[in-house]
Amino acid sequence: MPPPPPNRREQATAAPSSTDKSETGAGAARKEDNIYIPSYISKQPFYVSGLDNEEGDSLLHQRARQQEEDKAAQAAALLARGKKAGPARTKWVKGACENCGAMGHKKKDCLERPRKFGAKATGKDIQADRIVRDVKLGYEAKRDVYSAYDPKQYMEVVEEYNMLEEARRALQGDQKTPDGEGADGPEDDKSGFKYDEESDMGRDRATTKQSMRIREDTAKYLLNLDSDSAKYNPKKRALVDAGAIADKSAALFAEESFLRASGEAAEFEKAQRYAWEAQERSGDTSLHLQANPTAGEILRKKESEEREAKRRKRAEELANQYGTQPVISDALRETIKESETFVEYDEAGLIKGAPKKVGKSKYLEDVYINNHTSVWGSWWSDFRWGYACCHSFVKNSYCTGEAGIAASEKADAWDK
């Protein structure tokens, strides 16, 4: 009886020897033999140099496991960058940073605070070495935001959501049994989510929007019930005028997407805008135009009056400080006719012969202190500035009046 045929699967999965390795030519990246792969695919071609060279493996693009291992090692290398390689040394060694004492960088590249006397001179407070990896990244890897992401960081997000869930349950007052169910059973615990799934306005949806229409809203095709009123334009997909000419509907709109702004429409628009802006500023929902129109109207008028009072007060202050100029009325401006008077301008663009305007000073004008009747700098004598009212050369001094002038003249005569 002939012997049974050899088990080709066992022979294929058996560990090849060094000679088999050279014969098959799978290279260092070879993981396992597959009898179903033809020899012209599994063997390296003759023009690939080095059977033990990983870079010469022509089947490297089929090694998905090797690529995953390389990506994992690369991610680990990225996460390890910047960490301490071990405990710090107690003595400065040659080649270390002269500022902090760590290896791997020079003094000009050190990110520590510059010391007056570095670690090379003092030998104190030597920092530990940092892990420096030369990671070669491709075009996409350099722009991958999750290349050095640690999945353990997502636990912080999970904990935050758990805290929010606990706060929500505490707010709802869920009383749980030791079995982890609600007070009325397992269905009571999920009663809060039952209506969220059925409705379009769930509490957990980020894009919650009411699709309901208010009771006062009336469709435009119902404003005028005349059979010839609704004129539809198929190109614009809108009603042309809906017959709004002289009936009740004409007071609401004239044409499509056009509201009449006559009457109290402008005041209504201001009140609505004020209510919206007040809610955005303070978050107070009590100022609602439909729910509480009186409070919003009172506050709006109060702020308007305060704003107008501030404007008038500011105008009066400017008028008292700088004066006012006569305003030419419209009727007088119309009576002024154009003239043919010849006007000549100079190089600066100013009218020749016109009186020069005195520029306003940036300092306070006509402010008298310490009983003075003139400002500092109104008197000049002996190359010194002073007050003209008392001839005093001491700034911020108290005014002495005529007695000070007489004393100043007497002192000048005594000096002469």
UniProtKB/Swiss-Prot annotation:
Superkingdom of this protein's organism: Eukaryota
Keywords for the protein's UniProt record, in alphabetical order: Metal-binding, mRNA processing, mRNA splicing, Nucleus, Spliceosome, Zinc, Zinc-finger
Start and end residues, zinc fingers (CCHC-type): 95-112
PROSITE patterns: ZF_CCHC
Gene Ontology CC annotation, any one: spliceosomal complex
Subcellular location(s) of the protein: Nucleus
PANTHER family: PRE-MRNA-SPLICING FACTOR SLU7, STEP II SPLICING FACTOR SLU7
Function: Involved in pre-mRNA splicing.
Signal peptide: none
Species annotation: Neurospora crassa (strain ATCC 24698 / 74-OR23-1A / CBS 708.71 / DSM 1257 / FGSC 987)
Protein name, entry field: Pre-mRNA-splicing factor slu-7
Basic and acidic residues bias locations: 168-179, 188-213
Family (UniProt): Belongs to the SLU7 family.
GO biological process, one term: RNA splicing
